[in-house]
UniProtKB/Swiss-Prot annotation:
Natural source organism: Aquarana catesbeiana
Recorded family membership: Belongs to the beta/gamma-crystallin family.
Keywords, alphabetical: Acetylation, Eye lens protein, Repeat
Residue(s) carrying N-acetylalanine: A2
Domain Beta/gamma crystallin 'Greek key': 17-56, 57-101, 107-148, 149-191
Lineage: Eukaryota, Metazoa, Chordata, Craniata, Vertebrata
Name of protein: Beta-crystallin B2
Function per UniProt: Crystallins are the dominant structural components of the vertebrate eye lens.
Length: 205
């Protein structure tokens, strides 16, 4: 079920995960450190998030409490203001966070035109694809099957627009991965930086 992909299960968190949230831009003001899931940053004392420092991760933030709404993927690094973690719209709202489990060196994802894994598809193995159109796939994406690895899909080419986190499992409909419209035009792997493999992609009918 879709809820399985979004539930902040402590069993799946990485022990080394660490993120620091700052109230103001450029790492100023009050800060709050997390090493595990937080379903309500407001209840934890963080009314507003102005900047983020990821010591180890990766993490996924959500616009709403209880890991719902628009998603924001954070990998190790600095995010000094809101537009460094989103380019879909001006959204400064992050209400919940959880670590992302990355435990596979292999990455394989299949994206389908229609719900329930039907219609045209594009299969991607160990590769990042900044534009589906450039590789001959111009269809919508209504369902996704992640066979291995952890991925983030984007609404537009060049890793722009709304972000959608894909962990291992089946997403039978676009609502399962939090999309209002079945539109994904680029995808990349979330991985530890020591894993470098040249990959392949296979658009198929």
């Amino acid at each position: 079920m879709a809820s399985d992909h979004q539930s902040p299960a402590t069993k799946q968190q990485q022990p080394s995960s660490k993120i620091v949230l700052f109230e103001q831009e450029n790492f100023q003001g009050r800060c709050h450190e997390l090493s595990g899931p937080c379903t309500s940053l407001k209840e934890a004392g963080m009314e507003k998030i102005g900047s983020i420092l990821v010591h180890s991760g990766p993490w996924v933030g959500y616009e709403q409490q209880n890991c719902k709404g628009e998603q924001f993927v954070f990998e190790k690094g600095e995010y000094p203001r809101w537009d460094s973690w989103t380019n879909s719209r001006k959204s400064e709202s992050i209400s919940s966070l959880r670590p992302i489990k990355v435990d596979s060196q292999e990455h394989k994802i299949v994206l389908y035109e229609n719900p329930n894994f039907t219609g045209k598809k594009i299969e991607i193995i160990d590769d990042d694809v900044p534009s589906f159109h450039a590789h001959g796939y111009q269809e919508k994406v209504s369902s996704v099957r992640v066979q291995s690895g952890t991925w983030v899909g984007y609404q537009y080419p060049g890793y722009r627009g709304y972000q959608y986190l894909f962990e291992k499992g089946d997403y039978k409909d676009s609502s399962d991965f939090g999309a209002q419209h079945p539109q994904i035009q680029s995808v990349r792997r979330i991985r530890d930086m020591q894993w470098h493999q040249r990959g392949t992609f296979h658009p198929t009918n």
